[in-house]
Amino acid sequence: MKGFLSLTLLPLLVAASPVAVNSIHNDAAPILSSMTSKDIPDSYIVVFKKHVDPSSASAHQSWLQEVHTAHTGRMELKKRSLFGFDFEAFMGLKHTFHIAGSLLGYAGHFHEDVIEQIRRHPDVDYIEKDSEVRTMSEGSVEKNAPWGLARISHRESLSFGNFNKYLYAEEGGEGVDAYVIDTGANVKHVDFEGRANWGKTIPQGDADEDGNGHGTHCSGTIAGKKFGVAKKANVYAVKVLRSNGSGTMSDVVKGVEWAAEAHIKKSKKGDKKFKGSVANMSLGGGSSRTLDLAVNAAVDAGIHFAVAAGNDNADACNYSPAAAEKAITVGASTLADERAYFSNYGKCTDIFAPGLNILSTWVGSDHATNTISGTSMASPHIAGLLAYYVSLAPAKDSAYAVADVTPKQLKAALISVATEGTLTDIPSDTPNLLAWNGGGSANYTKILADGGYKAHNAETTVEDRIGGIIDSAEKAFHKELGAIYSEIKDAVSA
């Protein structure tokens, strides 16, 4: 009985991490599977060892095609010779990956016999089961003003007087490309002012449009004229999720590759107007070593990356791409300066940004808006803030550069100037940091020199903060009412 108990408890201990399955042969590459996401049957991501170059990868893929074709042929013969025998058709190779020279591999739909041969190939480092990925939104609520913009431009908690006041530098985002790796974008929406572009559709057979709204909402928070943090940035929609808000891990990796290649190509042109690139991924699934490596490779290529921490009120380190160490992982905060009830947390969470009841652009018309919640809404605030800061201090690989600002340096800078200690319900292993845009200053050097800020109200409760907002509103109301009464009294007296 003791042995049985230990075996049944084991999955509970490892459920949060990728585990190797079917690896009974020591000389075979392991197959990784995340216990926190849903695997896609017979779909795999294969990653090469570091010594494999593009030429060797191409030769391997030619070998793979031969193996897959031979297996398919044998199954066809078996089908013809055995009455009533049926077999699933396997697609074979789906994607190849070569991200910034540091991640080579491919994805596809293969029979287990083919996978066994791939596992034994000396070029293969590991195989990961492809899995479902989803958006990180938390459902619709009643529309309200975009308070999130106001919050990141003020140090102290919002009050009635600054509730809708966003302080910003007008040139924020100018010359910066923002890759939104999501469900697509409503590029014709008026809030984008013609700055939104369709980049790439990754899912096979899907339309070049956002049939969901999630990607459009994120894009608006990044770069919309009314709803955006960086109001002059360019948006490039990279569609990796279908209209239902879900997709495959391999499609997401391919989307990251497309963004990295587009950035590298743009940076080599020497365009004086180009200042750098940022990317946002408000999506996630279980732990995926491949996706984390892909994001890290894109950062190494020069893209400033923001990702959502996740909405399970759990440790963000157990989710991808939240666990990608070189990206900025973003948790969600509320109007009352508390951690949103759904927001993930932990040491992999770098910073918090507004994520509850966020108003932004939507689909259905070129004027549509919607209010939704999630770490999906928090991450675009940071992606927009990255674009904002890059435009004030252009990235190193920009021909317009006046400062050496790499993604690593800007991540450190963004964290260093954040507002500290203002949030409640923050676990002890989680940074209590809220994003800040410099309060409207366009002087990047001064923003960094001024450094971070410890909130005066760090010890107050959520109830106190809400009460303060209500008190401020009541005082303003009574003041206005008194002025109206005086005017009426004067008019009557006259």
UniProtKB/Swiss-Prot annotation:
Q: What is its EC number?
A: 3.4.21.-
Domain Inhibitor I9 as annotated: residue spans: 43-136
Q: List residue numbers at the site (Important for catalytic activity).
A: N311
Pfam families linked to this entry: Inhibitor_I9, Peptidase_S8
Give the first-level EC class, as a single word: hydrolase
Q: Where do the record's glycosylation annotations fall on this chain?
A: N244, N280, N443
Q: Where are the residues of the annotated region IgE-binding? A: 180-198, 209-231
> Where are the catalytic residues?
D182, H214, S376
Per UniProt, the keywords (alphabetical) are: Allergen, Glycoprotein, Hydrolase, IgE-binding protein, Protease, Serine protease, Signal, Zymogen
Signal peptide (from-to): 1-16
Q: Which GO terms describe its biological process?
A: proteolysis
- Disulfides per UniProt: none
Q: Name one GO molecular function term.
A: serine-type endopeptidase activity
Q: Provide the residue ranges of the propeptide in this protein.
A: 17-136, 454-494
InterPro entries in alphabetical order? PCSK9_ProteinaseK-like, Peptidase_S8/S53_dom, Peptidase_S8/S53_dom_sf, Peptidase_S8_His-AS, Peptidase_S8_Ser-AS, Peptidase_S8_subtilisin-like, Peptidase_S8_subtilisin-rel, S8pro/Inhibitor_I9
> Mutating K226A has which effect?
Significantly reduced IgE-binding
Per the record, the domain of life is Eukaryota
Domain Peptidase S8, residue spans? 146-448
- Coiled-coil region(s): none
Q: What does this protein do?
A: Serine protease.
Spell out the PANTHER family in the cross-references: CEREVISIN-RELATED, PEPTIDASE S8
**Into which family does the record put it?**
Belongs to the peptidase S8 family.
What name does the UniProt record give this protein?
Subtilisin-like serine protease Pen ch 18
Species for this entry: Penicillium rubens
